A protein has these predicted regions:
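Zinc-dependent deaminase catalytic domain
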Residues: 1-190
């Protein structure tokens, strides 16, 4: 079926827009990363939102965001950050005040009985050292990220190199992705 034939099955204004305006379709990397961004919108941390998606065989098999374990009140629920309340520098690690689980760790935990050998993790930030250990132990073989984590994470890179895990920074064209979301939302109007 050709595009002109397809337009007969769509509302006229939408069909016209699709024909005159180039339809944007994300490639797989963009799709999986956009899914990680969407996962981050569920983060329960009030200071730092992060999301992760694990893909294997061209499918999402797990996702996660930074948030507290079940039953543990989050900063979002409390209305304050535990680190701020304790007067701890936000960038300090291992103080024990932050009770959230990182997005990468949550994605691994949320994977239900799926073998992660050879999978790819898409995350907003380059993983910290602790998450790098979990990623290596899980069998994930590639990590794609948008930004470097706030701190230097040379141990994470070392872990990935020893475990032969590929890692690469991805460039995301936000304007194109927002335009695609807008196209999708327009197509849902009646």
């Amino acid at each position: 079926m050709t595009l002109p034939e397809i337009k007969d099955f769509m509302p006229k204004d939408i069909a016209k827009d699709i024909i005159k305006e180039k339809q944007i379709r994300p490639d797989r990397d963009q799709y999986f990363m956009l899914s990680a961004v969407i996962a981050a919108t569920r983060a329960s941390c009030i200071k730092f939102n992060s999301g992760a998606v694990i893909a294997k065989n061209k499918r999402i098999i797990a996702s996660g965001y930074n948030g507290n374990p079940p039953g543990v009140p989050s900063c979002h629920e409390q209305g304050f950050c535990n680190k701020d309340a304790a007067g701890v520098d936000r960038s300090s690690k291992g103080s024990g005040h932050c009770l959230a689980t990182h997005a990468e760790a949550n994605a691994i935990v949320q994977n239900h009985e799926q073998n992660l050998q050879g999978a790819t993790m898409y995350c907003l930030h380059f993983p910290c050292n602790e998450c790098a250990k979990l990623i290596a132990s899980s069998g994930i073989k590639e990590v794609v990220y948008l930004k470097m984590y706030r701190e230097q994470v040379p141990k994470a890179e070392l872990i990935f190199n020893h475990a032969k895990i590929k890692f690469r920074q991805m460039e995301m064209h936000y304007d194109q992705m927002l335009k695609k979301i807008e196209q999708v939302m327009k197509s849902t109007k009646e």
